[in-house]
Regions:
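Paired small-residue
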Residues: 13-25, 215-223
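A late C-terminal transmembrane helix in Major Facilitator Superfamily
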Residues: 245-280
Length: 315
């Protein structure tokens, strides 16, 4: 990550090189979070696995909240190349911290064989969870991608106020991330996810009606932020649990594919949102996002029901 950011992004001679460097950086990003999830769960008792994942992803949400304004500040005052230089230095700090702070006694996993990796890609129970992840985030990002113009054009906030609203949304996301982990630890992944998805469906439908009412829209967005990423810990710990059961030799691969499903959902939501804005209008994105999240809610309910025979058999 520091190498691709420092020597490829910072010193990019042209735009094409910069794009390639960012793609390589994205590969490192996906690997980090897939392995990080399994490391986080291995450091704590099983009943605290979701909270451990929440703390790890909490770092991502804090970075998103603080990194965007800091990156903008550096770019405006020193130049865009210096922004990448600063990011690469942070990457070096993270590398050193990992070497010093992550225990070396964590038991390693055997490398997944090709057949194990294929099983991860084809096992219906894992594919079901990937679909839940992609649809859950696709629905949220159908509306969130256009949150700034909605708050400005529909709710009537100034551009400066919208920046503060997005910061507040990010803080809500960070809070929801930790809360979601505790919820999954206490009640189990499936009940927690069903509750969070149901709340997101309701909040997106409420936002459909409050988007044009300034203060009501603000409250809806801030509350929605708590639930938007609250499902991350539950989804990640759930896919790890299912992978340990169905593909025990490829848990890291399954974890990584769930991270890929997150990103697919974000891309999917952005595309759907763009099509909605182009053909139907900006005001219609919340309810369409709610329908997509509703499908995720139904699928996680189905996955939970499929778990029950296994529990009976084990008992």
């Amino acid at each position: 990550f520091p190498y691709t950011t420092l020597f490829r992004s910072w010193q990019s001679p042209d735009y094409s090189t910069l794009v390639i460097a960012r793609m390589l950086t994205g590969l490192a990003h996906g690997v980090f979070f897939s392995i990080g999830s399994t490391i986080a769960t291995s450091l704590v008792p099983k009943e605290k696995a979701a909270s451990a994942i929440a703390i790890m992803f909490g770092g991502l949400t804090v970075a998103l909240v603080t990194g965007v304004p800091l990156g903008t500040f550096i770019g405006q005052h020193f130049g865009w190349r210096e922004t990448f230089l600063a990011v690469s230095l942070l990457g070096v700090i993270a590398l050193v911290a990992s070497l010093l702070l992550v225990p070396s006694s964590i038991p390693g996993r055997a490398s997944a064989s090709l057949s194990d990796q294929v099983k991860v890609l084809t096992h219906p129970r894992l594919l079901l969870i990937y679909a839940v992840t992609a649809l859950g985030y696709g629905g949220v990002f159908t509306a969130f991608t256009f949150l700034a113009p909605m708050m400005q054009e529909l709710a009537g906030f100034s551009p400066g106020a919208v920046s503060w609203i997005l910061l507040g949304y990010g803080i809500s996301v960070a809070i929801g991330n930790i809360w979601g982990g505790k919820l999954a630890d206490k009640h189990g992944a499936v009940p927690a996810l069903k509750f969070i998805f149901a709340a997101l469906v309701a909040l997106l439908m409420i936002f459909q009606f409050t988007a044009s009412m300034q203060y009501a829209a603000l409250v809806t967005v801030l509350v929605m932020g708590i639930f938007a990423f609250g499902n991350v810990p539950g989804l990640q710990v759930y896919v790890v649990q299912k992978a340990e059961r169905y593909t025990p030799n490829a848990v890291d691969v399954a974890s990584g594919l769930n991270i890929a499903a997150f990103n697919i959902g974000i891309a999917l939501g952005s595309v759907i949102g763009g099509l909605v804005v182009e053909h139907v209008g900006l005001t219609q994105t919340p309810w369409i996002g709610a329908v997509i999240v509703l499908i995720a809610f139904l699928l996680i309910g189905l996955s939970g029901r499929l778990d029950k025979p296994a529990r009976v058999a084990l008992g």
